[in-house]
């Protein structure tokens, strides 16, 4: 019996695989916001685009895939926006999986109206629903802050922020002096 237990323990220890997650690969590691940005509160979004437009709030749409290295790299920037602007904007981060099957782009109250088919895509809508920023790929957080600040009437021209990596999985947003 002891020999059986010893063999079983050895098999368990020898056949386990390490948990690997890598920001620089197009592999699925789980939701990118808790893993790479340390902020699992971003998803699911706290509001819908339709509600945000109805309430005339500035909205930031972020289209991503959990298995995209570019989306993983943008996660700390989007998390930084949430940290800085949480009570002033509606941040709506959406995976594009469900949007790929919905080809209708006629309703501007729905996110797929704005998605151009590429990821990551960051869009800023003003309180009237007009697109004020639309860019694919990596975006500088200061560029986003400048546009949001202008739309909210808040002067943040003296503030500059940077995304600093703590390790491969976590980053922080800090203000540059």
Language model region names:
Residues 2-9:
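Sec-dependent signal peptide recognition
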Residues 14-18:
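N-terminal signal peptide c-region/cleavage motif recognized by signal peptidases
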Residues 79, 90-132, 141, 148-152:
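Thioredoxin-like thiol-disulfide oxidoreductase module
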Residues 20-48:
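N-terminal "domain-start" segment that seeds a small globular fold
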Residues 46-50, 70-85:
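Typically the conserved alpha-helix immediately C-terminal to a functionally engaged Cys/Sec
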Residues 50-67:
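Short active-site neighborhood of thiol/selenol oxidoreductases, capturing the structured segment around
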Residues 42, 56, 67-74, 115-118, ...:
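Solvent-exposed, acidic/flexible segments
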Residues 137-177:
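Thiol-/selenol-based redox modules, centered on thioredoxin-like
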